[in-house]
Amino acid sequence: MKALEINNLSFGYKDSEKLIVDDLSFDINKNEFVTIIAPSGTGKSTLFRLILGLLKPQKGNINILKDGNKNIIGYMPQKDSLMPWRNILDNTAVGLELNGYSKKEARKVAATYFEGFGLKGTEKYYPHELSGGMRQRASFLRAIVNNPSIILLDEPFSSLDALTRRKMQSWLLDLCQRQSNTVFMITHDIEEALLLSDRILICTELPYRNLKSIDVNIERPRNYETTLSSEFIELKRDILNVLDSLEENKGGI
């Protein structure tokens, strides 16, 4: 079953003659973790804004698996974007409130996730009182508490220091291995993509037209020892070769 289908999608901003996306088609299966890799500044976040409905394509369509009568998308941006005037529990419950839950009901549902997300005890804290990693956990919980059809992660750990980023990657890896979610992630970190993903899409030309799909056939559960395996290193080499070829063909991006 397809969680996301993109068919012949084209888009360009009005103040530019160039298209960012040109007749692009791909899909993501339900409960699949897919990552797209491309250099920074090439329009990956624009693709997410199209999926979220914040931008309207000039051509093509986007189909998202519906949950009953709802078409719910979870979104986690690069920065946590938590509301500073709300405590952590109220921040994580806001999506439920927007979908018709009373504040009391929303808090009750959100609170059931706190222990599994390593957030137990932070319910009454405010965002400025937590570390960057803990704020990102709360942001991810806010993205999935509605049980969305698909979760979009826009370079979720890029703003964190290297040590915290590694801890958060391990946490997300463990979380995704314990529960089934459909995830579409943007990153330029090849190791992060290989560690977390079932499949990786690589931009092979600009504007976005053809995406090379690479299956990450590395056994789960995975951990950081996985990054030292011959399979992992070989896949990383393959991806680097594709990206190097793109740079050479386009004279750099």
Spans of model-derived segments:
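Conserved signature/switch motifs of ABC ATPase nucleotide-binding domains
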Residues: 125-128, 146
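Conserved ABC ATPase "signature" region
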Residues: 104-122, 174
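Hydrophobic anchor residue at the start of the ABC signature
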Residues: 140
